[in-house]
Structure formats: C-alpha cells, structure tokens
Amino acid sequence: MSSTYPYTERFDVVRGMPSEGRSRRAILDDLATMASEEDKAWESGQCSGTMYCGDHDHYAFMADAFKLFAHVNVLQRDICPSASKFEGEIIAMTLDMLHGDAVHDTTPAGLVTSGGSDSILHAMYAYREHARQHRGIERPNVIKPETAHAAFDKACHLLGIELRRAPIDPATTRADVAWIAEHADADTIAIVGSACNYGYGTIDPIEEMGRLALERGFGLHVDGCLGGFILPWGQELGYDIPLFDFRVPGVTTISADTHKYAYGFKGTSVLAFRDIDLRRDQYFFLTDWSGGKYCSPGIAGSRSGGLLAATWAGMTSLGREGYLGYAKAIFETSFAMQDAVEAHPELRLMGEPTFCFSFTSDEFDIYHVNDFMRPRGWRFNGQQYPNALHMAVTRPQTQEGVADAFAADLAEAVDYARQHKDEPAKSGAIYGGVAGGMTNEADEFIRSVMADMMDEQQAIP
C-alpha cells in the first residue's frame, strides 16, 4: 500500500468533477474514518511536535467558533467588523506576552499571517521596503545563523534579497555574533536570531545581537515561530531562559506562531513589530485601479474569518493561567526526557535546550536509534550535519507514562545501536546528511527526489 495514497483501495478516487453529488452523511463518514486512523499517529505522545495541543475538546471548541465565521471574508470589514475585534485582540495578547509594554519610544503593532513562513516572509518584505524607502538600499542582504529556519532562505529567494549564513559555535549551537558583525555591511537590512531554533531548541545570544543591530543601524528579527508562545511562560515559571523579546533594545520584529504553542488551528501566526511604521512599510496600496481603491495589510487578499475566530476563542479560553499550566507540564516532561538521553554516555544533547531538544552520538550513527524506536511508534524529526534526532515536546508527551516509555525504549535503542554500529543505518538515507558533505551531484539528485515527492502529494494514483 502506498504511504501517499493509503485509502485508494477503500475509498473512491475522484478523478474529475462528479456528475452527481454524494450524500453529506457518506462524505462525513469517510472523513471520520480517515481522521480517526490518522489521529492514532500522535495520540500516544510519541510524535515530535506536529500536534501541539492534542486536546480533542479544545479542538471541538475552536471548531465551534470556526464554523460561525468560516464563510466570512475578513477583507470585507463592513460586513464582518468582528474580524477587527479578533485580529486586534490576538495581536494585543501577543504583544502583551512579548513585553510590548517595554517599548516607550515607538508604538508596537502586529500582523496576523497564515503561518510561521508567512510571518518571516512579511518581516523580510518589511525590512526590504523600509531599507529601500528610508536608506536607499537597492541590493539588500540579510544575515541569519545557519540554524535559523529554512523559511528565511525561501523568503530571501522570493524577494531577491542576498542571504548570508553565519556559522554557529559547535559547542553551544548558538550564532557566532562576531562573524555576523564582520560580514554585515552598508547594505545589511536585518540580522536574524532564533528563540529557539527548530533544529536544536537553543536560543541565540539575542541581547548581544540587539546591541550590534543598534550600533550598526539595521533590524533584528527574532524567530519565535516555535518558541514564541512557550518561552515567555517558561521565564515566568523560573526557568533559565535569556531575554529575547521587546525588552531587548534592538529587537525590531518577532514572529510567533499561534498555531503551535498557542494551541490554535493550523494557519495562523503573528508578526510583532516594535514600531508601527515598519508594519506600514509592507502595506500594499493601489489607488488608480479600475476596480476601485485597493489596499491590503499583507500579501493575502481574501481570508476566512473562521481562523481568526477560532484562534481568538482558543487564546481567550486558556488565558495566562492555562498557558502557564501547559508550559509547566511541557518543560518538566522535556527535561525528564533530556535526563534520559544524558543517562547514556554514548549520547549527547546539542547545546543547552529547553522544551525542544536534539541529541546525537559520537560513538555510532544516531539513526540506528531511530531505526529501533520507529517501529515502537516514536516519530522523531531527523537532522543532518551532524546527524541527530529532534524532539519538540508538546502536550501529548505530558501524558502519564510517556517520558518513562521514552527512557525505556531509548535504553534498548542504545544497546541496538552499539550492536549495529558497523552497519549503515536504515533511516540515514531518509534523514541524514550526505557522507563527506553535500556535492553538486548529490544536491541535484536530492532535489529531484523531493520534486517527485511533492508532485506525488498533489496528484491522484
């Protein structure tokens, strides 16, 4: 059975527009079957990231809010003024959490986008337009640590911005700020720091980067897409988490995904600005169109009111107390799982992570551990250079017994890896780096395989 098309033999494949419609009941029955089977992949708590809440009651509550506004286009605020309430209050709650009140010389603002990559794209667009209008920069560049998300590479590719990749300290996995300072120039429009980075769960030296940004006069974007809605609660709980938000002078934008640790539905994120004027630099206007005067705050035109309503409902139903409670359980579980990793001399954590961690081995290929644990139901995210396994701890992992099961299975996996260390790992070809480093030929082959995979995912069998 194809992993891409597992339902081919059980459900009809729609190969063209049906001549007659099916009954709604039959359609919903099919959907319920698929959903029930797919939920099993994460309900056990063995799946890294992906499902951040895992509470079906919370999902049902947000679905109730969603369906009330699912048909509404928030572009038309005269018909749905509620969208301004939802959007404005989502932004206000996010700015409150990120200490927008620490800003006194400008007016903080925000933009609700469709996800983390979209927030990053809008941030890079805002910096490009601001630099063009106010600094006369026509050939802009951005500097990011090599660990910063691939969305920055995508955004710079789409926007025609040169991207420079700074190395990290291999011991701490944090950005090399001295390298950034040396390679920034008069055309640098922004630098990037992660809080935390996706790969290792470590936080870049944001305060040091903020001082550099102020000294050199460019922006500092903090990518909190993953950590933005949990690290603030970790700070409040007393964990040793460095400053990364608007309390740091020099931080000009922060991305934080409401569809991750704010526990909203997929399809929303917030881009927070220290200065509303920077947000205005990425607005779009067309005043002489035959269809009338047109404007949009971001790249999207039409958007469903359902996602705004559901996100707003989810955030206001949890409140500070709810978020703190969930964060406490997640941090405690993450550190228990990290302790299980550190119990094995052959394994080591990458840097000093918090709720999200990655581990590797200098004794054997870590993908031997993955080979053993995947049949047990564990789904890690694979890393490369060096090969490593990543676990973003979410609410499903906080269920009773999950951390203990992780420790027990990991111990057996390490024994397995010791016994098979002279053999190639089975999953290394899927996740791991190319031995000896990437070559042009290997890069071209991998791109071809990925393109075929994406074509398959958008086709029918």
Stretch-by-stretch model annotation:
Residues D12-V13, A70-D78, H104-L111, R139, ...:
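Glycine- and acidic
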Residues Y59-L68, I91-A102, D245, Q282-T287, ...:
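Active-site-adjacent bridging/hinge elements
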Residues A63, E87-A92, L121-R128, D153, ...:
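Predominant activation on well-ordered alpha-helical scaffold segments within soluble catalytic domains
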Residues K67-G116, A126, H130:
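Conserved N-terminal alpha-helix of the aminotransferase class I/II PLP-enzyme fold
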Residues M1-S84, G88-A92, S334, A343, ...:
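Non-catalytic terminal extensions of PLP-dependent enzymes
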Residues E236-T354, F359-F364, G437-E441, F445-S448, ...:
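Active-site C-terminal subdomain of aminotransferase-like
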Residues Y7, K85, L111-P297:
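Conserved PLP-enzyme active-site core in the AAT-like
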Residues R22, A26, D57, F61, ...:
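Conserved active-site and cofactor/substrate-binding residues in soluble primary-metabolism enzymes
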